[in-house]
């Protein structure tokens, strides 16, 4: 009896795929989706950093959830960390110590989780800044801007709740200084709201279990839903792109999803995981065993939150002790910190609609803008970054005063003055800088690139020769070119005058034949790009509405 032949796995999968396609016909739609094109600019990877960091957060968070006990019940520590043996603490702090010292890989996963949270929030901030300065939030992508703003706000509070759960001295001070004091200061409902959150006076016995539920269930679920909606909108509305040869408001130039984009994304995800793994293994963060358990009677100097909440801490430190009285109710200074936070969040979410309202720009935009081309928006963004940086530095005014031997009162007043003066000064400087860059671009398009060659005229005058970027007239003068919204070359080496580096590895050059083939391929690609640019310019010139709208 002959043995049965083992079926080939490829044939089995092919037959199953054929059966599925004959029933549900997904092949046409799947082929169309896999043929989607994505642009390849490096700045588009910032959003992927946030996405992959969130995936790492989910995986490490699930692992930590298996061992963390969010109870605030008092226990006596008898673990392996000798300096804290016999010390009374909460179960939350005890379980965090056990994760750090007794669970296999616990400290490694804890630190990866914390670093991933910082990278997630930082990536969202930088990603939003890129979208803001390039105008990617304009119609029809206002909804994605709102989603990104909500993701940043949720990430800030998710991180705040996360590092508050271990119940160490630093996290307890943060809860007392921010959540408890601000809540108590709210008029009319402050006391009732504080009792609802803490179950009585601070610190109570129910806050950490509630933060735990928010941190591992509610907020991550909302973030996951918003990320899914964000990706769906990007997929449906197509990705924005920078202006360039062959790129218009109605197409996308880049690489297809399969195989190039998928393989690049997979490699980038592996790189993010590797970097976070190295950070978690070599860079210590939040060593709670050095801080000890939280005691309401103890307060440590030099206490600051993570960077994304430091601006709120700085605002609380430098805000004057102003109290207002309405209907026999006192509104203390900490409440105004919460009011300003809410105002900042509202301005962040509604900015696309405010810009559209004041500029009257209701057109659809798929091409991005260079920051210099929109000086008002760029100046507003620089002003906001300056405001954030001043408040962040104000959050460490005690450390600055200690290290530089400055009066703490002086650092407070420096922060107050800087919060008002520096953003306005940066706005003016940025605006003038953008105007200067615009004039520099127009000068090159009109006269050409400076060559550094000085020529003496017959009557004795000296001039510098310029290399025209386009055709010249009968007298040899360059014909001014129209600005296309892309980078303008300012040096001769940008035109290839300095030659190109030799191809090959670090030690050995490529063979002559291979080097010649690579040069020929580069030349063909440049000619193809120039041809596409000429066709695009001709189509604009022949179109009655071809002139680009100005913002």
Curated annotation (Swiss-Prot):
Its EC number is 7.1.1.8. Heme 1 binds at residues 113, 215. Keywords: Cell membrane, Electron transport, Heme, Iron, Membrane, Metal-binding, Respiratory chain, Translocase, Transmembrane, Transmembrane helix, Transport. The keyword RNA-binding does not apply. The cytochrome bc1 complex is composed of a cytochrome b (QcrB), the Rieske iron-sulfur protein (QcrA) and a diheme cytochrome c (QcrC) subunit. Belongs to the cytochrome b family. This is Cytochrome bc1 complex cytochrome b subunit. It comes from Mycobacterium leprae (strain TN).
